[in-house]
């Protein structure tokens, strides 16, 4: 527990219908008394009161006030929420009036959540799930964040930790009494648990980073020769003029990026410079960046002009076999297009469209969503959402693979202890100040 009472605006700053302010700590009720006068406040009940500046008695606003008693609050401390009108002036006056009280200060970013963690209201994975929920922009990101915030990863890692503690207790018992012979049944059970955990952690790590990709966004790059309709496709996807569309080859010279929600998945679309032979050094640099963006993307859309399909250049031809590539044949309104397997591979989705006439685009969207599901949908299994989880799990796995119960039990016990610690690093059972500071600094103020 920390003695200092903290305060912050939890809602977004600026003009709004309602603003929410949060106070956490032992002085919460005293501050309410200073603002509203003394009254019998019952936990979890809403009160409508006039709030005034304590020093001048000037009316600040009429507000709703809710009190949450320590064990039933978000932070595990006494918490008061004040709901005012969303006026900038009200926010300034209320903040100034509250901070005039001794023993209270403005909260640091993430400090409310940090207190919730320190008071045992949530573990670190749940706290980070809360961050992901706040930052989620699509349905699938929201779904993953809710699962983590409700303790899906915490339950899994705590279960693994419990199994390792069980084995460690077996081993330490025989280390303390070396004259006792370990029964074969105990050895078999311990080996079985270690083998099962090794397999489960390996499978968990072999998730092709779906949780991390979903959290950060799926990168989709659009490339192709000049004037195939790449910028027109970007404009269609964004439903605005995000890129200049022109008949002049080489109009797009740099990578243009847009963040979209497609089928509930966060898609980062990158329109790239058209690929062709050019003597212009600026355009050459744009083409170079296009190929890098294409290579580093998760989903690739290769645009081909239906009126010029027989003259696909070699650079483009090499891109046809990339994983998760969708081949889009554009301008089918200008020619009677027919698929030719001698020109295009048959193992990739080939979508014939007319961006001008808005033909074939529903199927293109379906293909994008289909690839997004393969890349970033973890299904019903818990997903690793952060690199720090992955690093700790890899280290725990390496230690489990070293455990040999047939030889040195002291060494085996130490390997198990270290594996347990790495699992505890993830959930925060072992509190490392540097890790805590980094995690909670990423929160917004007021959370």
From Swiss-Prot:
Q: Which residues bind Mg(2+)?
A: 231, 252
Q: Which GO terms describe its cellular component?
A: cytoplasm
For this protein, the record's InterPro entries field holds: G_TrmE, GTP-bd, GTP-bd_TrmE_N, GTPase_MnmE, MnmE_dom2, MnmE_helical, P-loop_NTPase, Small_GTP-bd
Q: Where does K(+) bind?
A: 227, 246, 248, 251
Residue positions binding (6S)-5-formyl-5,6,7,8-tetrahydrofolate:
22, 81, 121, 447
* Any GO molecular function: GTPase activity
| Residues in TrmE-type G domain copies | 217-373
Signal sequence range = none
Positions of GTP binding:
227-232, 246-252, 271-274
> Keywords on this record?
Cytoplasm, GTP-binding, Hydrolase, Magnesium, Metal-binding, Nucleotide-binding, Potassium, tRNA processing
The reply to whether ATP-binding figures as a keyword in the UniProt entry is no
Give the cofactors, semicolon-separated: K(+)
Name where it's found: Cytoplasm
Instruction: Determine the domain of life of the protein's source.
Output: Bacteria
Task: List the GO biological process terms.
Answer: tRNA methylation; tRNA wobble uridine modification
State where it is primarily located.
cytoplasm
Q: What is its EC number?
A: 3.6.-.-
Query: What does the UniProt cofactor note say?
Result: Binds 1 potassium ion per subunit.
Assembly and partners are described as:
Homodimer. Heterotetramer of two MnmE and two MnmG subunits.
* Role played: Exhibits a very high intrinsic GTPase hydrolysis rate. Involved in the addition of a carboxymethylaminomethyl (cmnm) group at the wobble position (U34) of certain tRNAs, forming tRNA-cmnm(5)s(2)U34.
* Similarity field: Belongs to the TRAFAC class TrmE-Era-EngA-EngB-Septin-like GTPase superfamily. TrmE GTPase family.
Protein's name in the database: tRNA modification GTPase MnmE
What is the name of the gene encoding this protein?
A: mnmE
């Amino acid at each position: 527990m920390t003695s200092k009472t903290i305060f912050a605006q939890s809602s977004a700053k600026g003009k709004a219908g309602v603003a929410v302010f949060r106070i956490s700590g032992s002085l919460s009720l005293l501050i309410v008394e200073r603002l509203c006068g003394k009254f019998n406040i019952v936990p979890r009940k809403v009160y409508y009161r006039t709030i005034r500046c304590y020093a001048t008695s000037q009316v600040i606003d009429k507000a709703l006030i809710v009190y949450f008693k320590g064990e039933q609050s978000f932070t595990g401390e006494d918490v008061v929420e004040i709901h005012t009108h969303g006026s900038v002036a009200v926010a300034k006056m209320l903040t100034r009036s509250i901070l005039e009280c001794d023993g209270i200060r403005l909260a640091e970013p993430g400090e409310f959540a940090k207190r919730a963690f320190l008071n045992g209201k949530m573990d670190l994975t749940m706290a980070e799930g809360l961050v992901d929920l706040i930052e989620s922009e699509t349905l699938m990101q929201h779904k993953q964040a809710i699962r983590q915030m409700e303790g899906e990863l915490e339950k899994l890692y705590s279960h693994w930790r419990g199994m390792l503690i069980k084995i460690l207790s077996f081993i330490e018992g025989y280390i303390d009494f070396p004259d006792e012979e370990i029964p074969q049944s105990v050895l078999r059970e311990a080996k079985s648990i270690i083998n099962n955990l090794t397999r489960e952690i390996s499978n968990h790590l072999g998730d092709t980073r779906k949780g991390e990709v979903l959290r950060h966004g799926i990168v989709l790059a659009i490339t192709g020769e000049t004037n195939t309709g790449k910028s027109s496709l970007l404009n269609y996807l964004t439903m605005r003029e995000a890129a200049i569309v022109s008949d002049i080859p080489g109009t797009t010279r740099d990578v243009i990026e847009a963040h979209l929600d497609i089928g509930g998945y966060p898609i980062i679309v990158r329109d790239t410079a058209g690929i062709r032979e050019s003597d212009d050094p600026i355009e050459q640099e744009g083409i170079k960046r296009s190929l890098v963006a294409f290579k580093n993307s998760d989903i690739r859309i290769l645009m081909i002009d239906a009126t010029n399909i027989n003259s696909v250049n070699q650079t483009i031809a090499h891109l046809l076999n990339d994983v998760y590539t969708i081949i889009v044949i554009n301008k089918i309104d200008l020619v009677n297009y027919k698929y030719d397997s001698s020109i295009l591979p048959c193992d990739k989705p080939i979508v014939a469209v007319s961006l001008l006439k808005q033909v074939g685009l529903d199927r293109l969207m379906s293909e994008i969503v289909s690839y997004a599901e393969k890349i970033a949908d973890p299904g019903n299994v818990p997903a690793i959402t952060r690199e720090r989880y992955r690093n700790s799990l890899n280290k725990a796995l390496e230690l489990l693979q070293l455990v040999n119960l047939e030889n040195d039990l002291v060494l085996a016990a130490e390997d198990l202890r270290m594996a347990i610690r790495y699992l505890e690093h993830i959930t925060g059972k072992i509190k490392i100040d540097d890790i805590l500071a980094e995690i909670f600094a990423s929160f917004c103020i007021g959370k």
